[in-house]
Regions:
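Active-site loop-to-helix "anion-binding N-cap" substructures in soluble metabolic enzymes
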Residues: 2-317, 321-395
Length: 395
């Protein structure tokens, strides 16, 4: 199974534009993790705002722009809808009249949109180098080797794969082919409950922290019920006995942004802001989740702040762009919202989608040139869609 990424044609140049062409003929795996230079990148040239508006107006209903919560403000301004990756993919599928789906997010999100939309719709990623370090931590070859290890241990037949939405199309297809389902950070508990009705064990991909937090915090398992499979070690670094004894086989993957938060971050913010409520994403480490007051997805975080009383104080452990927008939004309601960590840190691959890339994309489409199309091959799409459909059927 393979994922085909196309950018066609490559010889078209828009009008003069300060554009870093990393997303054209670039390796999507060339940049991983996060950068913490101390501040967010400077806003792009304000003259580009009018060009973006003009190109979008020219395209009209032919284009539908999706903006992930972690995108820059200058990109979110032009999004028709915002949300998490699964919500945006569903929004795209519900807009069949749009010929072009411009996904302002990262590579696996655009793949999911291509899987769920019709063949007539074309999904475009403004910068092909906007990858995801977590999704890159589980390749099809590595997961196949893991399944072989489970087979050798005699447990593959009783193991159900559950893959996080933040995974490649190949991993989603593997999951569908082997009787598993996809999950989001919002429905991970339901997905695990379903999986344990189908089998005795779960192989959770690729985020170990979401898998562990859901199993222990939400389902009452112990940490001893969980083992971590390291794809860079023979047999995952585990004995056959360890695999047979485990209920949760967690892939050794993580989100580089959420992985930065620590218990020290929690203790420090409590010392600095008396009475603060600490709210973190379940992609954080287990000890951070245990030290927090509340845990939930990006949608949960937004709703929690909407329902919070005036005068309340909140430290949020998730991506900086979203936290900054929430801080600005709720300041008018006398709600103090701060970033959990003192170190200013954002998702560098999300931030590759900037206004210059968006303008280049929209102007190219307006001129009739298809660029940076994301296409998932039919076999991969078929099995990946099966896994997604199982998730949609969860109670």
């Amino acid at each position: 199974m393979r994922v085909v990424t196309t950018a066609q044609p490559l010889d078209v140049q828009p009008t003069p534009l300060a554009l870093l062409l990393l997303g054209r003929e670039a390796d999507p795996k060339s940049e991983r993790g996060v950068e913490c230079p101390g501040d967010l990148p400077s806003p792009s040239d304000p003259d580009l705002v009018e060009r973006a508006r003009a190109a979008k107006e020219k395209l009209g209903d032919k284009v539908f722009i999706l903006g992930h919560h972690y995108q820059r403000d200058e990109v979110i301004e032009f999004a028709d809808v915002t949300g998490d990756s699964f919500k945006l993919a569903k929004d795209a599928a519900a807009k069949p009249e749009a010929e072009y789906i411009v996904f302002c997010g990262v590579h696996f999100m655009a793949e999911s949109a291509d899987i769920l939309t019709s063949d007539d719709q074309k999904v475009v990623l403004p910068d092909l180098a906007a990858g995801c370090s977590m999704a890159d931590m589980a390749t099809a070859e590595q997961v196949a080797e893991c399944w072989d290890a489970l087979t050798d241990a005699g447990i593959a037949g009783v193991t159900v794969p559950v893959s996080y939405m933040n995974s490649s199309a190949d991993i989603k297809a593997f999951t569908g082919k082997h009787g598993g389902t996809i999950c989001t950070s919002s429905n991970a508990k339901k997905a695990l409950e379903w999986a344990f009705e189908q089998g005795e064990k779960v192989l959770f991909l690729p985020d170990q922290h979401l898998g562990r937090n859901t199993a222990v915090r939400d389902m009452g398992m112990s940490l001893d019920d969980c083992v971590v499979y390291n794809p860079h070690k023979p047999n995952g670094g585990l004995t056959a006995e360890q695999l047979r004894d485990a209920k949760m086989i967690l892939w050794r993957g993580h989100c580089s942004v959420h992985g930065r938060f620590s218990v020290d971050s929690v203790n420090d913010v409590r010392a600095r802001i008396p009475g603060v409520n600490v709210l973190v994403h379940p992609e954080c480490k287990h000890e951070v989740v245990a030290a927090a007051d509340y845990v939930g997805s990006t949608e949960y975080i937004i709703k929690a702040l909407e329902a919070a009383p005036a005068g309340s104080k909140w430290a949020i452990g998730t991506e900086l762009n979203l936290v900054r927008r929430l801080a600005n939004r709720f300041a008018a309601e006398d709600k103090e919202v701060v970033f959990l960590d003192k170190t200013v840190c954002f998702c560098s691959t999300m931030n590759r989608i900037d206004l210059p890339h968006l303008v280049w994309t929209l102007e190219s489409l307006a001129e009739g040139t298809l660029v940076n199309q994301i296409q998932v091959d039919k076999e991969t799409e078929s099995f990946a869609k099966l896994a997604l459909q199982r998730m949609l059927a969860l109670p």
